[in-house]
């Protein structure tokens, strides 16, 4: 049985409208988590979403009310924490149907570049600039021409390339 992903603590701070003093309005696990039934242990946890740069600072409502998609809103941004289960827990049991269902559920069906010949079933490509920080453990960035082994503290700048993330641990 796959281990449940660890909740991600989300702290949201603002300046009080009346006193202009800073305070926390939320300190709890992020309420916006999407799982993938085909990959037990996978979790996409959104922390914050903006609908335009640089993001409003005053009179902002909860940002997670926007649809939970892979791509940010047009002109906006998204901060998320993703947990990847070991590939062994799903690889060989996941095909086009499951992968397409995942990308459709995440609001980005066109992002999937699934092919039976692809180096990983969850290959994807979006027109986004992604900053990926490895928080713990190790993971492999799968690209069309190569793979890059990453460890905690490594950072990837993903510039709209075809890629997947592969957790090759037990």
Task: Describe each region flagged by the PLM.
Residues 1-63:
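N-terminal leader/capping segments at the start of a protein or of a new domain
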Residues 2-3, 70, 121-123:
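Short Gly/Pro-enriched turn/cap motifs at secondary-structure boundaries
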Residues 21, 138, 162-164:
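Structural motif
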Residues 29-30, 78-126, 159-162:
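Conserved short histidine dyad/triad with adjacent acidic residue
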Residues 46-70, 78-84, 91-94, 101:
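Terminal, intrinsically disordered low-complexity segments enriched in charged/polar
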Residues 75-77, 85, 147-152, 160-170:
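Ligand-binding loop in jelly-roll beta-barrel domains
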Residues 118-152:
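A short beta-strand-loop-beta hairpin characteristic of the jelly-roll/cupin
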